[in-house]
Amino acid sequence: MGELRSSVAESFSLTQGGPLYRLQLRFGHAQEERARILRRALFAMVVAWVPLLVLSTINGSAYGTQLQIPFLHDFAVNVRFLVALPILILAESSIDRKWRLLVLHFLRSGLVQEPELPSFEAVIRRVTRLRDSVLPEAIIAAVAYSSFLFGAHTEALMGSASNWHAPGLGSSLGLSLAGWWFNIISAPFFRFLLLRWMWRMFLWALFLWHVSKIGLRLVATHTDLAAGLGFLSLGQKRFSPIVFAGGAVVASQVGNAIAYDGATLAGMKFVLIGYGVFAILLLVAPLLVTTPTLIKAKAQAVLSYGALVTSHNQSFATKWVDGYAPQGDEILGNHDPSSLIDLGSSFQVV
């Protein structure tokens, strides 16, 4: 049987869709060429970071000793918009390509057989419709702006320390122009991109969950120890830049707390441990949705392979242990011990 092909699977994407993508497409900024991706990342940095630098320089809070936290000394803000923000954009292309390859591998590996192809394509179309829906990104945007709308303007502040965000006050009162830009434009924009990645991860997990229900041709003796689904871990590894971006933001905020607010590294251990646990769960969770299917495949294989191994072992024992081997047959050089070991090894994999 030849390799299955599907134009629906070949066009699979979790990043090339949604209201913001369509807006970028209209202005010619959504193409996947490397130069255009770099321009998108640079444009995002220009919008989020450059105005903060210009406005804080104008009011004298970009550098110097008159403030405890001048703009250029604020680890959290600079790491967020000069390191994490471009990563969230630059990672889109490589992660999306890897996801597409994994989707196609379901067909190339024979996990999806021809009778299940329509169901497989239906799952892709369902996930694509969710990706293109306006409502999810609208909710993400609302959440991203919620802290500003409800008056929580303290994201860049460190206790009562004077800073570029609200010089001399250390509160949300009397925000500088740079502080207003941060709260209205920069911070919500970053949160939107980060939350949109969480949405994409949910879509990927949803795809895997639905696909695991369509009747995959799983092989319990597969040497990847996951019945042939071990390749899915490659997609989670490719997601590591997003985890790194989040980790950089957390680390920079911890740096601010230690440098300017008198915190200690030991005192911040729960923050660091908490993010570490969250990052692990984020990487592992999409794979966990296949667990019920794998458990079912294992249970079925234990019975079927167990019966086969039992029958083979009984025949081997009858022939070679009980002494019923044909006249002239010798165990040395015979294929029976080899088949016994091979079948036993397969059962151990199960």
Q: Which residue ranges define each predicted feature?
A:
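Alpha-helical bilayer-embedded segments of polytopic membrane proteins, i.e.
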Residues: 39-50, 237-248, 275
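Transmembrane-helix bundle segments that line or gate the permeation/cavity pathway
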Residues: 1-218
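Juxtamembrane inter-helical linkers in multi-pass membrane proteins
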Residues: 104-123, 163-171, 205-232, 291-329, ...
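Membrane-water interface at loop-to-transmembrane-helix junctions
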Residues: 224-242, 263-273
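Terminal membrane-anchoring module of integral membrane proteins
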Residues: 244-258, 263-277, 307-311, 315, ...
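Generic, well-ordered alpha-helical scaffold segments in large soluble proteins
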Residues: 53, 57, 101-105, 109, ...
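C-terminal structured domains
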Residues: 268-284, 288, 292
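Alpha-helical transmembrane segments and their membrane-interface junctions
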Residues: 54-56, 136-161, 241-260, 340-350
